[in-house]
Amino acid sequence: MAAPLRIQSDWAQALRKDEGEAWLSCHPPGKPSLYGSLTCQGIGLDGIPEVTASEGFTVNEINKKSIHISCPKENASSKFLAPYTTFSRIHTKSITCLDISSRGGLGVSSSTDGTMKIWQASNGELRRVLEGHVFDVNCCRFFPSGLVVLSGGMDAQLKIWSAEDASCVVTFKGHKGGILDTAIVDRGRNVVSASRDGTARLWDCGRSACLGVLADCGSSINGVAVGAADNSINLGSPEQMPSEREVGTEAKMLLLAREDKKLQCLGLQSRQLVFLFIGSDAFNCCTFLSGFLLLAGTQDGNIYQLDVRSPRAPVQVIHRSGAPVLSLLSVRDGFIASQGDGSCFIVQQDLDYVTELTGADCDPVYKVATWEKQIYTCCRDGLVRRYQLSDL
């Protein structure tokens, strides 16, 4: 992958005034970094600044919310996107997780201020406060219906909430350590949780009961993903007949991102190991790109792309900085990744440039969610940022 380009986090404000400047840099692996600047030469009648770049950099295109820059010497090209809107009043401290409902109307987020809130996705207006976890909430997500929320906390509890009246309808107990991530199986009759206690569990929402321990790996499970398996993949057979309360687990894979540098893939119904991959550092997050391709991100900044059919060697390893990879999300023909140094970027196969979501100034971007052409991020600086993409 080409050398990463970086830009001043508030470039859009800085270049809005005459002679305003913003710094730029290019970081080719194993070579000295290149540094430069952008300068505003004036504002056009359409409100778009006229911007020139210092030697070694080229401005390909600019509008109010985006600027496309190249560094020809390193064959690097990035389109930087400024937030369309920023929501600063949802939380008062670092926001650890967020999700957007399937119809795009609502957002849910959790914060180190001790709260979990539901808000209007269009303007950040507060709708509901979800109270009931003891200690911090680590993860929250909407069910496919968009009317119900699943959350996991440091109190080792998993809870299901009504987004309409903020009532907690189900509490799952059984984990012995904080819950770090969750996944929803199919339409949501079953859910999966991953915990610091080293186990992943399958739950029956209707009866609020544990259907079984899917894996017990003796190491904290930081991230989990469920995906439909390509029919060429052997998922193994269950040792005992699955419960009739298990719904939608067949032909599904379960991916576990583990603290002990291991990425584990299982048949969700069979509980049988499909592969175990050892990475360079603790795995923080993982996602499926297709029925056989997956991504997983590590604490030392590596993004591994693996093929389940031949998982011994990665298809590719993307490394843009040594900052921890904190979230990965599949999008059309590619993926979005966020890291602990504030970078958040989109790689799409059909584009010869990387799209960078700017605004966070070296603060970790913990989670990314999308709805149609909109991307939402949450950050340690306590802000939710919404970006508008022309094509996603």
Curated annotation (Swiss-Prot):
> Which PANTHER family does the entry link to?
26S PROTEASOME REGULATORY SUBUNIT RPN14, MITOCHONDRIAL DIVISION PROTEIN 1-RELATED
Recite the UniProt keywords alphabetically: Acetylation, Host-virus interaction, Proteasome, Repeat, WD repeat
Sites where N-acetylalanine occurs are at A2
Is the Protein biosynthesis keyword given for this protein?
A: no
Q: Please provide one cellular component term from the Gene Ontology annotations of this protein.
A: proteasome complex
Superkingdom in the source lineage: Eukaryota
Mind telling me which Pfam families this protein's record contains? WD40
Q: What is this protein called?
A: Proteasomal ATPase-associated factor 1
Which InterPro entries does the record cross-reference, listed alphabetically? G-protein_beta_WD-40_rep, WD40/YVTN_repeat-like_dom_sf, WD40_repeat_dom_sf, WD40_rpt, WD_repeat_multifunction
Q: Whereabouts are the WD repeats?
A: 82-121, 125-163, 167-205, 209-259, 270-308, 313-349, 353-389
Subunit field text: Interacts with PSMC1, PSMC2, PSMC3, PSMC4, PSMC5 and PSMC6. Interacts with SUPT6H.
Query: What does this gene product do?
Result: Inhibits proteasome 26S assembly and proteolytic activity by impairing the association of the 19S regulatory complex with the 20S core. In case of HIV-1 infection, recruited by viral Tat to the HIV-1 promoter, where it promotes the recruitment of 19S regulatory complex through dissociation of the proteasome 26S. This presumably promotes provirus transcription efficiency. Protects SUPT6H from proteasomal degradation.
Which tissues is it found in, per the record?
Ubiquitously expressed, with highest levels in kidney, brain and testis.
The transmembrane residues are none
One GO term under biological process is: transcription initiation at RNA polymerase II promoter
Task: State the family named in the UniProt similarity comment for this chain.
Answer: Belongs to the WD repeat PAAF1/RPN14 family.
